[in-house]
Amino acid sequence: MVNYKQVEAMLSKHIVRPCGSYIVDDMDSIMWEGIFRKVANGGAPVQAGIVLNRMKAVIKYAMRRRRVERDDISLLRVKDVGKNPAQRKRVLSIQEIHHLISLIDSSKMARLNQILMKLIIFTGCRTSELTNARREHFDLDSCVWTVPGALSKNRNEFKRGLSGVSVALLREAMDMHSFDFVFVPVLSGRDVAVDRSVPKTAARDLMMRMGGEPWSCHDLRRTVRTNLSALGVAPHVAEKVLGHKLAGMLAIYDQYDYVREQIEAMNKLADYYMKPIDLQNEITS
């Protein structure tokens, strides 16, 4: 999900404050390149590429509405001014998953935050989908989580099947308070969504306690997807779990939500995650 405050702050820092008086129709590609190269030369080549892409979108929007006539920025590529983010491939092993779950249970973090972190592990959701989740989004009797379009990355509502483990965790969380938001600030006593930084901070603390190769909350999502494949779950079902659009013609003609299949897949994954190491074969390297 796009964090608009972050985008606004980034554009304000690198574009509005230093270049806000410039007139777009007077700017050629060399002038644009100088702006982004300054960001890259300041030690942020990846951010230079991000700012370039954001500004391309801004200028295209202005072009469509005939507010500007010149679009020289479109001539630039990310590699002309900086570089693209490195593609992460981190997948946690089953031993690491077991260790992580154990660390969560033994941690001093509030129980509501423990549940938050466990649900990220067991559902493969985006953190923003969970931190902004409301009671009305869940039908726990049917093991279904409906993520509204406002919270999904592609802005389309989708249904996610839940395992029995996830349902039990959600019931526990909802029984802890009467607020509409499922995950609220522990000490606030207010019906507001928990801050988006909470899972990131918790993940960083847990990672430090674990040691070994670094990981992020998004790596837990990738781990879910990888293990679903390894467990024999059909690709289209695994993609539905993550809230991804199906590829190609399937996106047009296949509008089935595969909830029953998702629930079966997530129960299979939960069983794999919960089964003691000495009773299972590791299915991923």
Regions flagged by a language model, labelled:
Residues 137-144, 212-214, 233-253, 276-285:
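Short, polar N-cap/turn motifs at the start of nucleic acid-interacting alpha helices
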Residues 41-54, 64-127, 131-132, 141, ...:
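Basic, Lys/Arg- and aromatic-enriched nucleic-acid-binding interface segment
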Residues 91-98, 142, 151, 161-213, ...:
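Active-site/catalytic core of tyrosine-dependent DNA strand-transfer enzymes
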Residues 1-42, 58-61:
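Basic/aromatic-enriched alpha-helical hairpins
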Residues 83, 91, 147-155, 189, ...:
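Catalytic-site neighborhood detector that most strongly recognizes the C-terminal catalytic loop/helix
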Residues 164, 168-179, 184-193, 248, ...:
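C-terminal secondary-structure termini that scaffold catalytic or DNA-interacting sites
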